[in-house]
A protein has these predicted regions:
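Short, Lys/Arg-enriched anionic-surface-contact patches
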Residues: 23-33, 38, 74-83
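Charge-rich, low-complexity intrinsically disordered segments
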Residues: 47-50, 54-77
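Core residues of bacterial helix-turn-helix
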Residues: 57, 106-107, 118
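Short hydrophobic/aromatic patch on the recognition helix
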Residues: 64, 113-114, 118
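Residues within helix-turn-helix
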Residues: 51, 62, 98-101, 111-112, ...
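Basic, amphipathic alpha-helical hairpins
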Residues: 5-19, 35-49, 68, 72, ...
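Terminal helix-turn-helix DNA-binding modules in bacterial transcription factors
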Residues: 70-109, 131-133
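…primarily DNA-binding HTH/wHTH and HhH modules…
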Residues: 116-133
Length: 133
């Protein structure tokens, strides 16, 4: 429940334009960032490659990465990983799914690969995370 609320807060902050001294900032970078974050929300279970998201915005991967980094201070892959980890935590804490089912829902080839991804991102295995939460 806490994570679901967190995802809503993050999404709300992302979608709202940035207030600057000269008014609202609707720069190209922010526009690309908002579309990217919406796409990550909609497609991260299917594709987690930066190239996929760059193609959706009709720009090269290199240019896309520069735009996202300038707008957010983060690399696109970091944003994708953070979202996938939040999604995974939410699914694990729901109690409705096993680790294997969460791996399948998130589009991982197998639960071992998902476990490695989760541990590298959080420092804990999915099982350890569920026991501690």
């Amino acid at each position: 429940l806490l994570l679901k609320g967190h995802k809503r807060v993050v999404a709300k902050e992302i979608v709202n334009p940035v207030e600057t001294e000269s008014g609202l900032d609707y720069s190209r970078e922010k526009e690309v960032l908002v579309r990217f974050q919406n796409d990550v929300h909609n497609f991260s279970r299917k594709d987690r490659t930066v190239g996929f998201y760059a193609r959706r915005q009709c720009v090269s991967e290199k240019h896309f990465s520069r735009l996202i980094k300038k707008a957010s201070g983060q690399k696109p892959l970091e944003i994708i990983r953070e979202y996938v980890v939040l999604d995974a935590k939410s699914l694990l804490l729901s109690g409705k799914y096993s680790v294997k089912q969460v791996a399948e829902l998130l589009g991982f080839q197998n639960h071992s690969f998902f476990t490695r991804f989760f541990r590298n991102s959080t420092g804990k295995t999915p099982g350890e995370f569920m026991r501690e939460e």
